[in-house]
């Protein structure tokens, strides 16, 4: 009968949708694991060599004396995600714009600098002790091979760099607290924030404290919530430690420091040759020896993802 055929067709359609959703979920997980493996450095690799493959022009500006390391992350508004990178320095670097009382980009003209009139124009002090930080997260792409003439770079975000170290530290703590609150707020509204206790009264107290903390943040802003309050709620609610989670991701997607790499030394290489003594079989056979170099960067063994990839199926 027609209604039986329609019912069977509906069952087949539902079964096909279940199979399609399961396959799509598996494919998305496999794609994410692939992108995660691309940035799985774990404190390995020479930073300048890594940046050279990403942006050769920027790699020429890197100085090993600055103690540089490169960090990667996944991001973007679509899936598959984009890979972003940022260069960090962990040695003191003096910035002239942040420590000198002058805006060198707006120097007075020569004819006004020698003017001895009584009615001199007051010097504009705007921009003094001011620095703009342009070292943001940028996507890994092949656009550096193309000409940038006539191209508009979108989302070029500039972050301010305060000259006071205390102010920079306070801003960093405020940003870390905001990230924790947003993380807890997102888990709370998605229903993934679970309490560690099974006692009914304790669950009620935890739920009330979490709800009050989020409401105080939404009404009064970030200054109305203390960081220790957020830590207490996170300790009572979720088994996932936020700080350990962030530290783990930073460890995964961070290269080695340029301070750990030294240049090639001819004396050391010559000493290694003398240490062979009478055994020159390796040198005659042309077998490479890693003792000639103090550090050797090995390119990670990765595969390119294509639409035809089936991940072993």
Curated annotation (Swiss-Prot):
The keyword Cytoplasm applies. Keywords: Cytoplasm, Membrane, Mitochondrion, Mitochondrion outer membrane. It is found in: Cytoplasm, Cytosol; Mitochondrion outer membrane. The keyword ATP-binding does not apply. GO terms for biological process: negative regulation of mitochondrial fission; negative regulation of protein targeting to mitochondrion. One of its GO terms (cellular component) is mitochondrial outer membrane. Enriched in the pancreatic beta cell and the testis and is expressed at low levels in other tissues tested. Can homodimerize. Interacts with MFF; the interaction inhibits MFF interaction with DNM1L. Acts as an inhibitor of mitochondrial fission. Interacts with MFF and prevents DNM1L recruitment to mitochondria, promoting a more fused mitochondrial network. This is Protein MFI. The lineage of its organism: Eukaryota, Metazoa, Chordata, Craniata, Vertebrata.
């Amino acid at each position: 009968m027609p209604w039986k055929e329609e019912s069977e067709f509906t069952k087949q359609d539902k079964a096909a949708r279940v199979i399609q959703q399961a396959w799509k979920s598996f494919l998305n997980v496999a794609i994410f694991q692939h992108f995660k493996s691309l940035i799985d450095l774990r404190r390995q690799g020479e930073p300048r060599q890594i940046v050279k493959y990403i942006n050769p022009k920027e790699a020429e500006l890197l100085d090993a004396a600055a103690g540089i390391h490169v960090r990667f992350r996944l991001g973007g508004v679509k899936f598959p995600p984009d890979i972003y990178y940022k260069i960090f320095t962990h040695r003191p670097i003096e910035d002239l714009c942040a420590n000198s009382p002058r805006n060198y980009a707006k120097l007075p003209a020569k004819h006004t600098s020698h003017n001895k009139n009584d009615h001199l124009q007051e010097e504009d002090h705007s921009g003094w002790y001011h620095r703009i930080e342009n070292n943001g997260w940028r996507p890994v792409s092949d656009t550096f091979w193309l000409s940038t003439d006539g191209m508009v770079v979108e989302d070029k975000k500039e972050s301010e760099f305060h000259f006071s170290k205390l102010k920079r530290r306070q801003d960093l703590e405020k940003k870390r607290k905001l990230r924790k609150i947003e993380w807890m707020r997102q888990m709370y509204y998605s229903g993934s924030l679970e309490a560690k206790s099974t006692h009914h009264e304790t669950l009620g107290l935890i739920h009330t404290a979490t709800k009050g903390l989020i409401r105080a943040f939404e009404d009064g802003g970030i200054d109305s919530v203390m960081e220790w309050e957020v830590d207490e709620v996170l300790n009572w609610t979720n088994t996932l430690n936020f700080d350990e989670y962030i530290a783990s991701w930073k460890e995964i997607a961070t290269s080695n420091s340029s301070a750990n790499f030294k240049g090639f030394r001819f004396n050391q290489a010559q000493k290694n040759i003398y240490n062979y003594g009478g055994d020159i079989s390796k040198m005659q056979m042309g077998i490479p020896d890693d003792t000639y170099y103090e550090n050797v960067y090995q390119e990670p063994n990765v595969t390119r993802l294509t639409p035809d990839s089936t991940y072993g199926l």
